């Protein structure tokens, strides 16, 4: 397959490796690298061959078309859209009209005959691989063409010709000029690869790192039905999975979070082929939309392949995968360096200071906030309407949109997931984007001012009006030593990977309420008694629990995912999870909750915390929480997760709740389990030594302790000004608790708001000898550095 003994015109993938980027481009070199080096490690890549850069250059040279191309490009003003479009179209037509040199055509025919020998009906993907395309510093996101379901050698030859021509797409020409690449220095290789029949199954994209935070201990997988182009283009909202690498390495269940996408359409093979019509897009049946497109076992298998690929390349990777619908086998069809996340030492924290009316919501890309007037763009022909600072609102984007995307203050799309084109480019440009909103183009109106917030977790929100927000930057190399541990309070698992990148020594308070409220939203009793609910309520709950086998499994499974995400994000550091501390009015606000909750005058002092856990009316609901903790600790092996019991009023109640935990399979000391008590009622401090007999330590809740010590309601505007954790009475109680724990050699920390708000209070706690301060994430760095200054 060479040219009269000179350099080869066609090479098989198993002849290639990363040293061949100059010959076959990054994409093809990477496929060869994996076939050659990773096949024995469980990484499956479909076989194929590649035309070389030499073949491309000879094709242009022998025909003389290269002179015409470069002369035309040299006199074209590529910033003039009309000139660029005219020149690009002319160049592509020249290439398509130029016949292949006989040596190249024969080499392709010969390779095709070998590749299709076992199946004359086999179909192939013909993809471009530019010699500079997948360099780590250049994300040429999809600038050249891909042809799918190509059958027969003549169709392959036509597709290769179109791939060659795609090196001169308008966007590719523009990108090279702006990035400083010489047109003459970039060549194109066409990869011809046996297709995986994912049109009959599912496919998607995965990253060996969390794309939003740069957290490198998880694999992030997206998946949808049909061929993978829909996920890559952002035409569907895919399913999402996070897999924890250390747990996976221990051969334990390692999926820490699953999110079901709508998956409304899919790309499949067209029944009768015409050129350019080898595939078609169709609606996905409702029953397939309502289930995950991968099993848990398949998710774990893909994650293992991602880890092997990352380990081999020695860097985070962006990987496309496909499942064969005939055999059920999982294949890797592309792998390239992950181009976006190289997290520096400077951290930015965006904070929204007020919340307005929500106009649209979708998947948050990045953690920034942007604001400005809306421009709804329905078609690329309208791109000249975008002014710098506008909020770009559209159905979805493709690489043709890049020139206007960089002008936008934020991007909002109807369709797409975290690995779609709009998401990749938004990350690259550092612009906040909310993708997969469904109907943003209908709900948002041209000219209206909006604020686009990606600073609130996985969900991004578009708010009416321009809202006030701030950004804090902090540069952190290494943090100074302190005589205590600086931990943090985390409620939202969506933010856990991001917060884990801050300096920290674990989580002193992880609240279960956020998980129950946002990830579940249904009263546990309504799920346990699902069959007794009204049909309308049953339908509402069924809609919420898609992807789970039963109402009970929905509650336990979602809790497990939330707790596991927190445990995995900070692993192996300590993560203290406080079991549910909803008050009766808060439980009543959950779907189906009203019929099960008492109407209390003062829920703050009512049916809550430990008293709820041991009551006959709630005991089996509490058992669901215990089951989730057991799965996280015993099945997944995240034994860094400890549990904390809130609002323990009496010593008898302390004894009863520890006995109940043991009955539920959470026995203190077993498998290293530590049980911490929330010290937040004056009785807890006054009888600290007696309470500590049943627990492994205290975590001081200074908010409740202050309210109860001073007898005030801090939510009442009339008396709230008296609320101060630094009051002498409160400090006396805290001193008692700290001394009692120290005397018994047990842990004592604080997780209340006080040390986050008042650095002098944090300093006092340090002098008292407290073991840890658990702070709000936005105050960790500043408080840590301030305390270090005081110690000097």
What are these language model-derived features?
Residues 218-318, 323-324, 363-370, 388, ...:
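Conserved catalytic alpha/beta cores of large enzymes that bind or transform nucleotide phosphates
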Residues 112, 120-125, 130-140, 147-148, ...:
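Conserved alpha/beta-domain cores
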Residues 1-191, 200, 286-297, 302, ...:
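N-terminal beta-alpha lobe that positions the nucleotide/phosphoryl donor
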Residues 34-38, 210-213, 407, 423-431, ...:
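Alpha-helix C-terminal capping segments
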Residues 66, 326, 338-343, 347, ...:
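Acidic, glycine-rich flexible loop/linker segments
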Residues 141-174, 198-273, 333-363, 407-414, ...:
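Extended active-site and interfacial segments that coordinate phosphate-rich ligands
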Residues 142, 314-339:
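Conserved metal-phosphate-binding beta-hairpin within the catalytic cores
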